[in-house]
Amino acid sequence: MEPCLLMWGILTFITVSGYTTDLCDDDPPNLKHATFKALTYKTGTVLNCDCERGFRRISSYMHCTGNSSHASWENKCRCKSVSPENRKGKVTTKPEEQKGENPTEMQSQTPPMDEVDLVGHCREPPPWEHENSKRIYHFVVGQTLHYQCMQGFTALHRGPAKSICKTIFGKTRWTQPPLKCISESQFPDDEELQASTDAPAGRDTSSPFITTSTPDFHKHTEVATTMESFIFTTEYQIAVASCVLLLISIVLLSGLTWQRRRRKSRTI
């Protein structure tokens, strides 16, 4: 029942707030041995406030709100314990608000909630205490996701691998990122091959092409000479054969003429 209420709340929020952005209906593409992340989130993006086992959420979701000049996350996520010992209304706060605790690695990489680098976009929201290990976002049209291969895998082709949620023929769809991840163990010499491929053009790299151009010219010359000699020998053989056939024809005609004269002399 709770997921239905959550979706109803998200749709109500979008309708009441006057957002004209559309939520992406489908999930982002799932590539084998690859993960994706969003560097920034467009206004209208919704994040579920999911808690780990033994805790329940007080607010259902966070949403990225703002305008073209400023955007930030609203409705901070908080989790409350459901165990009998802690049912005194104690609510856990953000890790950075608790004294004596070191910030997690994710916190150190995440800027404050109101700090935004790109205008009209929200940054990754900071973690909250007893947060679920997996975050569920509801993206809007125009959101860009960046894909990269997992550890131990390498991309078959270099270049940016992005997926963008677009509206195509009235339906929201994610573009397919051009990324294929292959195990690094299958290509042990991939780094050397890539290094030779990515070598900048210069005197050292261009010299092999200069040295190979001369032998290629000699090869073409030798081939042409060979073809000419072959044509010459063929023509010579044809001429000799024609002369032989001509001599044979003369001998045959002479023999036939001699036989006719001999027959005539006998009849007389």
Curated annotation (Swiss-Prot):
Domain Sushi stretches: 22-81, 120-183
Record flagged with keyword Glycoprotein: yes
Compositional bias annotation for Basic and acidic residues: 85-102
An annotated Gene Ontology molecular function: interleukin-2 receptor activity
Signal peptide: 1-21
Subcellular location per the Swiss-Prot or TrEMBL entry: Membrane
Database matches in SMART domains: CCP
Subunit structure: Non-covalent dimer of an alpha and a beta subunit. IL2R exists in 3 different forms: a high affinity dimer, an intermediate affinity monomer (beta subunit), and a low affinity monomer (alpha subunit). The high and intermediate affinity forms also associate with a gamma subunit.
Segments of skewed composition (Polar residues): 204-213
Segments for region (Disordered): 83-112, 186-213
InterPro entries xrefs: IL-2_rcpt_alpha (IPR015486), Sushi/SCR/CCP_sf (IPR035976), Sushi_SCR_CCP_dom (IPR000436)
Cytoplasmic side: 259-268
Spans traversing the lipid bilayer: 238-258
S-S bridge residues: 24-64, 49-77, 51-79, 122-165, 149-181
Extracellular side: 22-237
Keywords: Disulfide bond, Glycoprotein, Immunity, Membrane, Receptor, Repeat, Signal, Sushi, Transmembrane, Transmembrane helix
Protein name: Interleukin-2 receptor subunit alpha
